[in-house]
Amino acid sequence: MKALLRQVAEGKDLTEAQAEAAMTLMMTGEATPAQVAAFLMALRIKGETVAEITGAARVMRERAIRIHHSRPLVVDTCGTGGDGSHTFNISTTAAFVVAGAGVAVAKHGNRAATSLTGSADVLEALGIHLDLTPEEVGRCIDEVGIGFLYAPALHTSMKHVAPVRREIGLRNIFNLLGPLTNPAMAQAQLMGVYDPNLTEPLARVLGNLGVKHALVVHGTDGVDEISISAPTVVSEMRDGFVHTYRVVPEDVGLSRAPREYIRGGTKEENARITESVLSGEPGPRRDVVLLNAAAALLAADRVRTLREGVELAAQSIDSGEARRVLERMREFTHRLRAESA
């Protein structure tokens, strides 16, 4: 570990294999807390490369508890968070819309870190039990069309690194790795990021990891989603090739709205917003969910364009299918807990 730490501290990039070696030492507890902290900060100051992120993500994926399912394709809508915008849980709400449109979702997520409410927090407030076994999560994906992959329960090797991350309190490579390490091996992904300079590199990383089609996005108003209030930078990766462009709501027939209209609050408030959107309430909250669900449907190759995706997402809500997915997930997790009681 000392040799790898010295190399990074000197501003020299690691190869993918070296990044894998460093990550393995950290995930197995062989690296000391001081070495982990120094490595993470040296890497942050130098700037993480595509090869370094790819190598680290490979190790984290390999060491995760795998979620097995029988769906031919699953999509994830997990983002980095950390944008400080305090929006409601847009990608989590969009996940129900995507599932309502017939595309299976393996939603990877966690509790809030820098925001008020993480995906795990809002799902609990919606009455969904999260303490499922890996086998039960796979069944939920198969039977309901959506499953929640609670990161701390599935990335148990993180126990060696988590205390150091908390003590540092600064962004580091692990802020990027969560959305890159879906334990159900999602082949399609919508990934929001907190920095526009990350869209293209992380799209390339997803291609390196075997994801077939992904959209990595950053709203220029600062949100780690496709924005309803400003242009969004989109790096679309399909079969390893990356194309970067900009999207505005008007491109898909939607109107812009101030970012204040999509602000969230406590987990209870955000749960109410999710339920209202899934129940068909019109307005900017619905529109931003339509936009992001459309991107996930495009990544899953369910539609050919974002505009088609918006139309299909609207059908998912207006037909009641998106709401029924939420209700089925709630009932499924309650039934499992009752059976195990």
From Swiss-Prot:
Homodimer. The lineage of its organism: Bacteria, Bacillati, Bacillota, Clostridia, Eubacteriales. GO terms for cellular component: cytosol. Binds 2 magnesium ions per monomer. It comes from Symbiobacterium thermophilum (strain DSM 24528 / JCM 14929 / IAM 14863 / T). This is Anthranilate phosphoribosyltransferase. Mg(2+) 2 binds at residues 224-225. The keyword Magnesium applies. Pfam families: Glycos_trans_3N, Glycos_transf_3. Mg(2+) 1 binds at residues 91, 225. It comes from the Bacteria. PANTHER family: ANTHRANILATE PHOSPHORIBOSYLTRANSFERASE. Anthranilate 1 binds at residues 79, 110. Pathway: Amino-acid biosynthesis; L-tryptophan biosynthesis; L-tryptophan from chorismate: step 2/5. Coiled coil: none annotated. Keywords: Amino-acid biosynthesis, Aromatic amino acid biosynthesis, Glycosyltransferase, Magnesium, Metal-binding, Transferase, Tryptophan biosynthesis. Its EC number is 2.4.2.18. One of its GO terms (biological process) is L-tryptophan biosynthetic process. NCBIfam families: trpD. Its cofactor is Mg(2+). The gene is trpD.
